[in-house]
Amino acid sequence: LSKFKGPASKPTGITHFVYAGGLHLDRWKALKEIAEAIKETDGKGILDIFTSKDSIELYHSNFKMLPVAFHEAVPHEHINEVYQKADVLVHTEVQSEKMKGFFKYSISTKIPEYLATEKPILFYGPQDMKLFEYLLQNRVALMASAKEELQCCVNRLVSDEDFTEMCKNARCLAEKNHCASENQIKLYNAIETVLLNS
């Protein structure tokens, strides 16, 4: 996790919201709503989307006239370079009856990486997801499940509000729950306890 922690982005007057990932499973629709919310800030922000070349070709036309810049995805070993250019890291899920059972209890592999960067995180997705509950309870991200909440979050993120405490909470959570070596120790101890009590 230490490799994901880096210097804060230098203020440029424009807040860079960064999303790195696929646009399938209707995620592009949620990202479009985020871009529309950013547009309402009158030039104070831009959404940088890092995704596959095929996804760019397939979905870019849906983002016309919106403050969005598309970039080709980078290999995972270089993803930290993308994160460090961000002012805000974006994660989104969509309400889908078809995929509801899958997403309800899942946590994207990007979440621990986002938490470790100590940068503000914007989550936009359904409230009934365990991920929503997890991030909200630990006070590590700005959360929105509806357009009105989303606009409020975006407005706060492009303002001069200080999110230092939230970002430090995120880093602590990453180290507590998402460190591979620590989790290996916890698993070993759990197995040892079971064996001793059997």
Predicted regions: what is each one?
Residues 108, 126, 137-148, 156-161:
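Conserved acidic donor-binding segment of nucleotide-sugar-dependent glycosyltransferases
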Residues 115:
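Short alpha-helix at the nucleotide-sugar/activated-sugar donor binding site of glycosyltransferases
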Residues 145-151, 161-191:
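A charged, aromatic-enriched C-terminal amphipathic alpha-helix characteristic of glycosyltransferases
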Residues 14, 42, 46, 51-88, ...:
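Nucleotide-activated donor-binding/catalytic signature segment of Leloir-type glycosyltransferases, i.e.
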Residues 1-14, 161:
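Acidic anion/phosphate-binding donor-loop and adjacent secondary structure
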Residues 10-28, 35-38, 167:
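Conserved donor-binding/catalytic core segment of Leloir-type glycosyltransferases
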Residues 26-29, 77-81, 89-112, 121-133:
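Nucleotide-sugar-dependent
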Residues 17, 30-34, 47, 150, ...:
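A structural motif in glycosyltransferase catalytic domains
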